[in-house]
Amino acid sequence: MASVQRKSWCALTIRLLGRTEIRRLAKELEFRPRKSLGQNFVHDANTVRRVVSTSGVSRSDHVLEVGPGLGSLTLALLDRGAHVTAVEIDPVLAERLPHTVAEHSHSEIQRLTVLNRDVLTLRRDELAEPPTAVVANLPYNVAVPALLHLLAEFPSIRTVTVMVQAEVAERLAAEPGGKEYGVPSVKVRFFGRVRRCGMVSPTVFWPIPRVYSGLVRIDRYPTSPWPTDPAFRRQVFQLVDIAFGQRRKTCRNAFVDWAGSGNESADRLLAASIDPARRGETLSIDDFVRLLQRSADRGGSDREGTSPPTAGQGAPAC
């Protein structure tokens, strides 16, 4: 079994799960990973250390872990001194997790809360304390919806560090105009800055997936450059969906129905300093926000518009 040493401020060492123990636990539970739930469990201690180190969490953090599975990442997060709320949709795994933690370090169990829930329905009033960070090996099938839901539902979250399918990682971190740039790229930047932090080999998981994973970190803007209320966010996201739903069209043509006419669409775009001949796939989150707010200035929205400062690109190095 692998182990990880705590910082000098605490002498406790928590044993991490290795491949042998993960298989033993699965056999004990008569558990077979379900592809429909994206159940691939990380068993490599170095990978777990890397994820936790990238997250930067400490004993002052309340970490929300999505899909803890058999507990590999959970143990490492507890070893950093953090409080962890683990959200697990599988009832068998949710029931077993506290016992696994107790077997590895009984004194840490008091800092663990397990919720047998679908993360997409999780609400802030279900948690005793607001989470400050998300650290997770996200199931491939819900990665983007889960990220957007958590960032919107929990404004207290300052950082998000997740392993996702490599293709999803590329899309999240893509820049305007790139072939991978799309709806997830824009929407996640409504909340913060995004950076890819490297690749993760399929061989560190059980069962071994067919694709590589990517490590991604999102840092929420310390002060949001624009309003963050749900109504404003929905209006911005509506524009994003319109633009990428017709990504081969010019912005002028894509926004005709939204603006009411081609001329009005062009006028709104020009008011936002956007060339109507551009395509939606070249617009940044700043452009979409500015388009909505300038439209409000023209009477095209029920919100008074103000020009946001730029959100900037990139994020702190991983």
UniProtKB/Swiss-Prot annotation:
Composition bias type Basic and acidic residues, residue spans: 296-305
Covalent S-S links between cysteines: none
Domain of life: Bacteria
Keywords associated with the record: Cytoplasm, Methyltransferase, RNA-binding, rRNA processing, S-adenosyl-L-methionine, Transferase
Residues where S-adenosyl-L-methionine binds: 40, 42, 67, 88, 118, 137
Annotated stretches, region: Disordered: 296-318
MF (Gene Ontology): 16S rRNA (adenine(1518)-N(6)/adenine(1519)-N(6))-dimethyltransferase activity; RNA binding
Catalysed reactions, as listed in the record: adenosine(1518)/adenosine(1519) in 16S rRNA + 4 S-adenosyl-L-methionine = N(6)-dimethyladenosine(1518)/N(6)-dimethyladenosine(1519) in 16S rRNA + 4 S-adenosyl-L-homocysteine + 4 H(+)
HAMAP family: 16SrRNA_methyltr_A
Protein function: Specifically dimethylates two adjacent adenosines (A1518 and A1519) in the loop of a conserved hairpin near the 3'-end of 16S rRNA in the 30S particle. May play a critical role in biogenesis of 30S subunits.
Family to which this protein belongs: Belongs to the class I-like SAM-binding methyltransferase superfamily. rRNA adenine N(6)-methyltransferase family. RsmA subfamily.
NCBIfam families from the UniProt entry: ksgA
Name the record gives this protein: Ribosomal RNA small subunit methyltransferase A
Organism the protein comes from: Mycobacterium avium (strain 104)
